[in-house]
């Protein structure tokens, strides 16, 4: 991954983390890796565990960012979530939500819950 792409991703994840904190989420992990799978942000609010993908665009895009969740991405997120739950047994009884935080430099953040 290029340094520019990594820096852009880190910036988007920082904005998304602050956005989730403003919604009373507790951030548990950022860039959680399990095998070859990654989840950008893992957070918890009440009894729900949120596994969130972050998409960051500097300019406005005329498409629905939820379409970035193809079957391969869903499979990898599920695998990473199972790994996190196996490593963190205290969250075994929480509800789980797979989400997207779309970050646009001009429009702010939009949060999509329960995508799959």
Swiss-Prot record:
Pfam families: UPF0102 (PF02021). SUPFAM superfamilies: Restriction endonuclease-like. GO terms for molecular function: nucleic acid binding. Disulfide bonds: none annotated. Signal peptide: none annotated. InterPro entries: Restrct_endonuc-II-like, tRNA_endonuc-like_dom_sf, UPF0102_YraN-like. HAMAP family: UPF0102. Belongs to the UPF0102 family. This is UPF0102 protein LA_2381.
């Amino acid at each position: 991954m290029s340094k520019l792409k990594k820096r852009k991703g880190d910036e988007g994840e920082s904005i998304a983390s602050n956005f989730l904190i403003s919604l009373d989420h507790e951030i548990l992990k950022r860039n959680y890796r399990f095998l070859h799978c990654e989840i950008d942000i893992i957070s918890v609010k009440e009894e729900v565990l949120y596994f969130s993908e972050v998409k960051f665009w500097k300019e406005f895009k005329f498409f629905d960012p939820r379409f970035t969740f193809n079957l391969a991405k869903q499979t990898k997120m599920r695998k990473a979530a199972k790994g996190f739950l196996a490593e963190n047994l205290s969250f075994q009884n929480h509800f789980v939500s797979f989400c997207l935080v779309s970050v646009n430099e001009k429009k702010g953040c939009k949060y999509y819950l329960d995508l799959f």
